[in-house]
Amino acid sequence: MRLHLLVLSVIVVSLLVSDNAHANSHDDSKTRALRETPINGLVTNQLAVSRNLTPAKFITNSEERHSSEKKSRRLQIYFHSPYYGIHPVDYHYVGSYESGVTTICSIVLFVMVFGCLYKIFSQ
């Protein structure tokens, strides 16, 4: 019984790690491409299509600050995702929200699996 649990936990952890590494490699390249490329609708649309997201609204906000400061221009993009509905995404972090959730879930499952293994083998 302990051997079966050990084998099962190793399989689950290896699948989680490989899936998380795969997701992070894609997100890093997309985020890097966004940082290196001028922000325009074309890049954002290509990224949205590659992430299976539909651009719902493109809103550009210009904020005038104090006379000693420059104007601040912020691009806020609203994506419609089948998983999360319509939500704003900062252009620097488009595509990394899902990988963050995946990483957190992987860490939680990793701790749970090894906590159970420790309990089983410490008896």
Swiss-Prot record:
Q: Which cellular component appears as one GO term in the record?
A: extracellular region
Family from the record: Belongs to the RxLR effector family.
Q: What is this protein called?
A: Secreted RxLR effector protein RXLR-C21
The induction annotation reads: Expression is up-regulated during the late plant infection stages.
- Where in the cell? Secreted; Host endoplasmic reticulum membrane
Q: How does it sit in the membrane?
A: Single-pass membrane protein
Primary location: secreted
What's in the keyword line of the UniProt record? Host endoplasmic reticulum, Host membrane, Membrane, Secreted, Signal, Transmembrane, Transmembrane helix, Virulence
List the transmembrane segments. Answer: 101-121
Query: What does the comment on domains in this protein's record state?
Result: The RxLR-dEER motif acts to carry the protein into the host cell cytoplasm through binding to cell surface phosphatidylinositol-3-phosphate.
Signal sequence segment: 1-23
Q: Does the keyword Transmembrane apply?
A: yes
Q: What does this protein do?
A: Secreted effector that does not suppress pattern-triggered immunity (PTI) in plant host.
Where would I look for the motif RxLR-dEER in this sequence?
32-65
